[in-house]
Amino acid sequence: MKKSLLAVMLTGLFALVSLPALGNVNLEQLKQKAESGEAKAQLELGYRYFQGNETTKDLTQAMDWFRRAAEQGYTPAEYVLGLRYMNGEGVPQDYAQAVIWYKKAALKGLPQAQQNLGVMYHEGNGVKVDKAESVKWFRLAAEQGRDSGQQSMGDAYFEGDGVTRDYVMAREWYSKAAEQGNVWSCNQLGYMYSRGLGVERNDAISAQWYRKSATSGDELGQLHLADMYYFGIGVTQDYTQSRVLFSQSAEQGNSIAQFRLGYILEQGLAGAKEPLKALEWYRKSAEQGNSDGQYYLAHLYDKGAEGVAKNREQAISWYTKSAEQGDATAQANLGAIYFRLGSEEEHKKAVEWFRKAAAKGEKAAQFNLGNALLQGKGVKKDEQQAAIWMRKAAEQGLSAAQVQLGEIYYYGLGVERDYVQAWAWFDTASTNDMNLFGTENRNITEKKLTAKQLQQAELLSQQYIEKYAPEAWARMQKLKAQSAVKTGNK
């Protein structure tokens, strides 16, 4: 909620308070009116000095006139003085003073002041954090039709922040704000309809709200709508439209849109493959600290592409940045690079990264960690632990791990030798993605089995395929059904 609240803290000098027209008054006339004690003129003169309009910019003079108007109880000036203390413009930043002046204006019903006072209580700036008090002021601003207040009320109910969480109420307040063009609220409504929060799930309506935000130029709306076109959710799948929207968001600096645009360009999903342009966008995302951008940049350097030479040093550098942020795939790939380099010290680094990724369920890392333990490279040889990690990878459907686990059972490495288990895992790998090693090893192992053991192995394999190779299992069932139809038609 903090991010959204910061977006609705009202900080601008103009267009926030409506001032009675002073007519076409020049600076000297304005000074005369201000010196005579006219509060409106004092505030306007403060504006002139603040912006350097018809005079030299002078923040000290501006603050003096703002204060004179505010001390007369002129509500717009009280609010403006609060802004100046909040921003530290013309005076040292002083949140406590900002709260004092905001409260004076808020108590007189100025919605902008009520909104900002609510934020001060929410963030604990100049006062102790008091979420209930913040909601009180947000509500007052919202009930006067202030879209920022309505958004903040939506946020409060969405997060359960100062009120009991209530998605229905959140949707109602977001709707009020969104109807006034509040883009954050449009995005929140898009999210709520996509998840069925406080409303029946409706991806088409979700897309409509994201579109409203995107059309207004909001980078998040563009990002979310691009995602919907990419996956074909709520709209017809359209990679070209997705690329356009990702590009619009990326140009505004959105790091997620930047790496996703890079991926579309690298894969050629909306035209010819453009790895060089992809590299540029990955780098923009990566340099903002986005772990996905760092991963994709590293991966492109790792494998290379037309116009992009392989660069191991760059790959290691960017994989490391992503890995240090906890990206499991980057950790696994970084470990793989170190393992290939060959020295004992590099093998140790590899094992460290394999362990981090494997603990998060990354199957390639589990497989590689199992192999390192089997070979005793970078770690003390431990066949029992190797078998444990290899099984974890095999049970996630990695056919190479299924073959390796079969070999572990075939040779009795860290487990009791079991040809039935070995055959079942080899057959699972063979069926999974037509792994040739699985097929060859299965045929070799079959010679070790009795007829009864082969039946047991076949039954066990069926269970493994159904559980650990579901796509292969679905293909098998489809073929069986087709075969049954053909047989029935004869």
Swiss-Prot record:
Immunizes 1/3 of injected mice against subsequent infection with E.coli strain CFT073, suggesting it might be a good vaccine candidate for ExPEC (extraintestinal pathogenic E.coli) strains. Its main location: other. The physiological metal is unknown. Its cofactor is Mg(2+). One of its GO terms (molecular function) is IgA binding. Mg(2+) binds at residues 122, 159, 161. Sel1-like repeats lie at residues 39-74, 77-109, 111-145, 153-182, 185-218, 222-254, 256-290, 291-327, 328-361, 364-397, 399-430. GO terms for biological process: negative regulation of immune response; negative regulation of neutrophil activation. Upon host (human neutrophil) infection interferes with productive FCAR signaling, inhibiting secreted IgA (SIgA) effector functions and probably avoiding neutrophil activation. Inhibits the SIgA-mediated oxidative burst by neutrophils, decreases generation of ROS (reactive oxygen species) by neutrophils and reduces chemotaxis by neutrophils, all of which are SIgA effector functions used to stimulate the immune response. Interacts with human secreted IgA (SIgA) at least via resides 244-260. Preferentially encoded in ExPEC strains (extraintestinal pathogenic E.coli). This is Secretory immunoglobulin A-binding protein EsiB. It comes from Escherichia coli O6:H1 (strain CFT073 / ATCC 700928 / UPEC). The gene is esiB.
